């Protein structure tokens, strides 16, 4: 984590996503997409961190990320996902869901498909039509699931004009994020601190399971599923707390970890190294959580001059039966169970809205209109 | 009224005819609205077709520049860092910190300038290109002024080092020499290049004597005839005493050596050693600080402050800061020679050389089209404790006044408002009220944006604004029929009145549809239920339904009764509650005890006796009354039957 490149881009960044690598590829990530918000004109942009020739003195590649192409986006970009190598799905504050297609030959983006009234308060066709922001989108080729402030869940299929399935009034409050649990199940988080699991095989508008934080009904803003253990889920809340859930048992989180001082906007397990977790927050911080057990020898290497904290799980309410196979995120043994936290950004000011990790690369975007990229996460 | 510092500039709005029609205008925080009215100036009755547009006139146009946004964002971080510099730090460490901050600001300006330059070159439209070029020159002037202020006010260089700093300053800003040098050295025969002597002269003018010597040696190689005098000139250049940063010699020593060297130069001039080469002779005159010879190089000097620094270098290298203003004024006069009048930039630099900080800031405020520069420079100088004595006759001090102006400009921008918040935070007197006024006016199109605004308010304990934002969101949600959301927002705002209103909507929906919506929320109210009586009732009433559903009849019955006896239930809802009691009364086993049944009866009688008597009755009313009367009759019957059963049961239980 020596070099982290910052670039000011004259737009507040709401989402960043790495382009997925082709299966079996040995390359490292080199292209990512960003979406902006709260500008007079918002854009979806593609950036490349590919080498531009200049070898620096240490033999590494010097230079920051370069803009490949961009396209106007109507409304704030609320969420962004790569559908496949070429297609990007964007959720808009206007309630519209758009699929953009990247043409690598002439470096342009175009609109491939659009569901203009995916989310709304008063229906299209009615004279008092009012749209509702689409807050989250998740893709699992060929399916696209979107959620919104209207509490609606849509299931789209690429190349289908209409929604395949819509659950109206799925939630009485705002749905903030969605993720696939295991097909055809999805998991949503809402603004009153609940996780709901929906099974598309079931008819009706009821979730198959509800999990919730007790008491305070703290809104949850983000959710990510463990890449290998599909029952382990991490969520981030308005109070900056990180919660780890085991959806197979109990209706309460397995552990609650005191983290940021303000809203946690995104949480991501590292896709290929899930002992590592990354979070970012409104308080302007970006954290790297390391739950791999060999902490002592690593610590000397890792936190030179950076603020590092050790913590142990504060609340645990799970009786562990099969300790050996369980993920370190669920373990409750206080001796083994230590997490090292490293703060990745040098000085904190405005909100870090988004982050994404792929291989050794991390990208994040802020309200201070900067995009930070590092290519050496585990150096 | 305060005297005007200059004629205000006239901005013409295309399409608006102020000659014929009266104008209407209104001030906003950073903008002004202008439109034509249909009133005529001369009261003629004919209607002149007026302009159909309302114009928004922005004062702080630079805020809207895409490239300058980077300047605003990047400098915001530096600004925050500066505010956090420990007040305890004193002396050297504090000064070096402040100099570092100043350099950071300047490097951001330079980065912006370079990017703007690239864009100006790449611009396809010439008008666009011109606009960018003019921006580049503005940025370059800002950096020039800032750098000088850094040397004079922050670094506070003493005699000796002062001149070295000024030389660096000139070298940094008169940089054509580098491309010229590359051009000359790249040619086949440098000393025969057209600009060879120009280059050598510029190098001497900038005090880059080592480089000048190397150039001279090329001339010596090329023409053996002048090799001798070139070597003499080279030796003079090499021996010129200068203060180097690592040197420990005192100023007096330096002055002595310098005097000695100066006399040596003088001798060569009198001996006419360089008479054969006019170029070398003019170089010698320059090195003697001859004003006439210097002024001959006006073209190469390009501006008066270069002239000033060169003049000082070769006539008074150990100039004291307090003497600067004398040399500055006379250099300006000599350089312009009465041919042209000084421009705003000249006046600003002159004011800086006079150590008149307030004049610098004032002139900059008038000359520059944005508040960024003055706000940040003033703030930095204030941290150097240079501005404390100065108070304005309005508002608070100058630093705060300028920061407020700048931050208000940011708030007028649709997306830079977040930066403005931190600037307001560091305005101790009026920052808070300004923030309060601005933050409420931010349009909230998504909940996410609302959450960000709320976080800003909550961090600063701005309870009034928090309540108002939550209320706006709750209202929006009600309008969109999102009752769950509305209730969440009113709970967050701790707005009891609104929570009551939303709870009523829930209850009304229940009465109409016979089932509750948004159970996920109502079932999880927890302690938030206590916010308002109506909300408590809603929560408890739903609990009753849940108990009933779970067939916990006894618990359900006593909860239902307590809702009425404790007066939590609104009277208008009592009939519904009593109706809900009907199935419980009709259960096979006795649920309401005799005591409870009496209570229920009292409630029913209470309700019916206080019913308003309808004077006039239409058919619909009558029909309603009919249903109502039937209901009451049924209730009375059930209650009586239940009472009978309860008395028997209780009597027999006691008996057994």
UniProtKB/Swiss-Prot annotation, chain B:
Residue list for modification Phosphoserine: 223
Subunit structure: Component of the nuclear pore complex (NPC). Component of the NPC Nup107-160 subcomplex, consisting of at least NUP107, NUP98/Nup96, NUP160, NUP133, NUP85, NUP37, NUP43 and SEC13. Interacts with NUP160, NUP133 and SEC13. Interacts with NUP37, NUP107 and NUP43. Interacts with CCR2.
GO molecular-function term, one example from the UniProt record: structural constituent of nuclear pore
Modified-residue entries (N-acetylmethionine), positions: 1
Disease: Nephrotic syndrome 17: A form of nephrotic syndrome, a renal disease clinically characterized by severe proteinuria, resulting in complications such as hypoalbuminemia, hyperlipidemia and edema. Kidney biopsies show non-specific histologic changes such as focal segmental glomerulosclerosis and diffuse mesangial proliferation. Some affected individuals have an inherited steroid-resistant form that progresses to end-stage renal failure. NPHS17 is an autosomal recessive, steroid-resistant progressive form with onset in the first decade of life.
Function (record text): Essential component of the nuclear pore complex (NPC) that seems to be required for NPC assembly and maintenance. As part of the NPC Nup107-160 subcomplex plays a role in RNA export and in tethering NUP96/Nup98 and NUP153 to the nucleus. The Nup107-160 complex seems to be required for spindle assembly during mitosis. NUP85 is required for membrane clustering of CCL2-activated CCR2. Seems to be involved in CCR2-mediated chemotaxis of monocytes and may link activated CCR2 to the phosphatidyl-inositol 3-kinase-Rac-lammellipodium protrusion cascade. Involved in nephrogenesis.
Annotated GO biological process: lamellipodium assembly; macrophage chemotaxis; mRNA export from nucleus; nephron development; nucleocytoplasmic transport; positive regulation of DNA-templated transcription; protein import into nucleus
Gene: NUP85
A UniProt-annotated Pfam family: Nucleopor_Nup85
Top-level division of the source organism's lineage: Eukaryota
Residue numbers of N6-acetyllysine PTMs: 92
Family: Belongs to the nucleoporin Nup85 family.
Keyword field contains Transport: yes
Annotated compartments: Nucleus, Nuclear pore complex; Chromosome, Centromere, Kinetochore; Cytoplasm, Cytoskeleton, Spindle; Cytoplasm
Entry protein name: Nuclear pore complex protein Nup85
Keywords of the record: Acetylation, Centromere, Chromosome, Cytoplasm, Cytoskeleton, Disease variant, Kinetochore, Membrane, mRNA transport, Nuclear pore complex, Nucleus, Phosphoprotein, Protein transport, Translocation, Transport
Cellular component GO terms held in the UniProt record: actin cytoskeleton; ciliary basal body; cytosol; intracellular membrane-bounded organelle; kinetochore; membrane; nuclear envelope; nuclear membrane
């Amino acid at each position: 984590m020596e070099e982290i490149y910052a670039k000011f881009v004259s737009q507040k960044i709401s989402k960043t996503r790495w382009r997925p690598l082709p299966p079996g590829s040995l390359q490292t990530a080199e292209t990512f997409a960003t979406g902006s918000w709260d500008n007079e004109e918002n854009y979806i942009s593609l950036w490349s961190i590919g080498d531009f020739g200049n070898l620096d003195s240490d033999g590494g590649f010097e230079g920051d990320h370069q803009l490949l192409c961009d396209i106007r986006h109507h409304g704030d970009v609320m969420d962004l996902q790569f559908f496949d190598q070429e297609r990007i799905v964007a959720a808009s504050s206007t309630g519209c869901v758009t699929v953009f297609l990247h043409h690598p030959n002439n470096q342009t983006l175009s609109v491939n498909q659009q569901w203009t009234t995916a989310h709304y308060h008063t229906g299209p066709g009615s004279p008092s039509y009012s749209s509702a922001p689409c807050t989250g989108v998740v893709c699992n080729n060929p399916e696209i699931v979107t959620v919104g402030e209207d509490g609606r869940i849509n299931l789209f299929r690429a190349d289908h004009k209409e929604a395949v399935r819509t659950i109206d009034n799925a939630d009485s409050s705002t749905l903030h994020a969605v993720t696939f649990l295991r097909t055809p199940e999805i998991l949503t988080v809402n603004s009153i601190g609940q996780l709901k699991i929906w099974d598309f095989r079931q008819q009706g508008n009821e979730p198959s399971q509800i999990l919730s934080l007790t008491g305070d009904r703290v809104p949850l803003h983000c959710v990510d599923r463990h890449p290998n253990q599909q029952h382990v889920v991490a969520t981030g809340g308005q109070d900056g707390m990180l919660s780890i859930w085991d959806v197979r048992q109990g209706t309460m989180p397995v552990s609650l970890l005191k983290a940021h001082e303000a809203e946690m906007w995104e949480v991501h397990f590292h896709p290929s190294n899930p002992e590592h977790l990354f979070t970012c927050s409104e308080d302007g911080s970006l954290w790297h959580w390391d739950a791999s057990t060999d902490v002592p020898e690593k610590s000397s290497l890792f936190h030179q001059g950076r603020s590092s904290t050790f913590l142990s799980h504060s609340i645990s309410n799970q009786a562990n039966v099969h300790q050996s196979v369980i993920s370190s995120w669920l373990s409750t043994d206080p001796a083994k169970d230590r997490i090292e936290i490293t703060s990745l950004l040098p000085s904190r000011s405005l909100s870090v809205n988004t982050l994404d990790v792929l291989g050794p690369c991390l990208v994040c975007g802020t309200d201070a209109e900067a995009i930070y990229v590092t290519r050496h996460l585990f150096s | 009224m305060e005297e005007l510092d200059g004629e205000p500039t006239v901005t013409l709005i295309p399409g608006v005819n102020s000659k014929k029609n009266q104008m209407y205008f209104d001030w906003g925080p950073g903008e002004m609205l202008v439109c034509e009215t249909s009133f005529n100036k001369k009261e003629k009755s004919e209607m002149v077709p007026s302009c159909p547009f309302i114009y928004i006139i922005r004062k702080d146009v630079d805020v809207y520049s895409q490239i300058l946004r980077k300047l605003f964002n990047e400098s915001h971080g530096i600004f925050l860092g500066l505010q956090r510099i420990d007040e305890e730090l004193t002396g050297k460490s504090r000064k070096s910190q402040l100099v570092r901050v100043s350099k950071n600001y300047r490097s951001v300006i330079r980065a912006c300038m370079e990017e703007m330059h690239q864009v100006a070159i790449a611009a396809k439209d010439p008008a666009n290109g011109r606009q960018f070029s003019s921006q580049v020159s503005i940025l370059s002037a800002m950096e020039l002024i800032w750098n000088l202020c850094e040397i004079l006010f922050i670094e506070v260089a003493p005699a000796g080092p002062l001149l070295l700093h000024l030389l660096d300053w000139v070298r940094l800003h008169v940089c054509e020499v580098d491309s010229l040098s590359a051009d000359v050295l790249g040619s086949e025969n440098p000393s025969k290049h057209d600009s060879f002597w120009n280059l050598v002269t510029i190098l001497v003018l900038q005090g880059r004597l080592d480089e000048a010597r190397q150039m001279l040696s090329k001339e010596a190689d090329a023409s053996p005839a002048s090799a001798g005098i070139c070597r003499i000139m080279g030796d003079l250049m090499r021996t010129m005493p200068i203060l180097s940063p690592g040197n420990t010699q005192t100023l007096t020593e330096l002055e002595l050596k310098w005097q000695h060297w100066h006399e040596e130069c003088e001798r060569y001039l009198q001996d006419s050693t360089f008479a054969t080469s006019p170029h070398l002779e003019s170089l010698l005159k320059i090195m003697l600080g001859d004003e006439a010879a210097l002024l001959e190089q006006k073209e190469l000097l390009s501006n008066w402050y270069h002239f000033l620094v060169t003049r000082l270098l070769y006539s008074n290298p150990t100039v004291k800061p307090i003497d600067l203003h004398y040399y500055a004024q006379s250099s300006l006069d000599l350089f312009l020679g009465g041919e042209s009048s000084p421009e705003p930039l000249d006046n600003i630099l002159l004011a800086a050389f006079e150590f008149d900080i307030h004049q610098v800031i004032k002139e900059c405020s008038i000359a520059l089209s944005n508040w960024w520069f003055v706000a940040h420079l003033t703030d930095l100088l204030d941290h150097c404790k240079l501005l404390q004595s100065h108070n304005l006759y309005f508002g608070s001090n100058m630093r705060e006044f300028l920061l407020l102006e700048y931050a208000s400009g940011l708030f007028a921008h649709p997306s830079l408002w977040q930066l403005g918040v931190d600037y307001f935070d560091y305005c101790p007197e009026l920052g808070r009220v300004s923030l309060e006024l601005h933050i409420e006016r931010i349009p909230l199109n998504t909940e996410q944006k609302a959450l960000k605004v709320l976080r800003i308010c909550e961090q600063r304990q701005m309870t009034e604004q928090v309540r108002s934002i939550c209320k706006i969101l709750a209202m929006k949600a009600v309008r969109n029929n999102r009752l769950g959301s509305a209730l969440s927002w009113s709970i967050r705002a701790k707005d009891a009145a609104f929570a009551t209103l939303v709870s009523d909507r829930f209850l009304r929906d229940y009465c109409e549809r016979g089932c509750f919506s948004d159970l996920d929320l109502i079932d999880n109210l927890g302690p938030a239920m206590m916010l308002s009586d109506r909300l408590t009732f809603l929560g408890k009433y739903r609990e009753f339904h849940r108990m009933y559903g779970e067939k916990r009849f006894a618990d359900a019955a006593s909860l239902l009764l307590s809702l009425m006896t404790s007066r939590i239930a609104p009277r208008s809802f009592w009939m519904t509650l009593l109706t809900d009691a009907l199935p419980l009364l009709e259960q096979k086993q006795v649920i309401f005890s005799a005591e409870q049944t009496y209570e229920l009866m009292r409630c029913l009688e209470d309700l019916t006796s206080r019913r308003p008597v309808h004077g006039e009755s239409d058919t619909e009313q009558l029909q309603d009354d009919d249903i109502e009367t039937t209901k009451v009759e049924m209730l009375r019957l059930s209650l009586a039957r239940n009472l009978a059963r309860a008395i028997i049961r209780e009597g027999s239980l006691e008996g057994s």
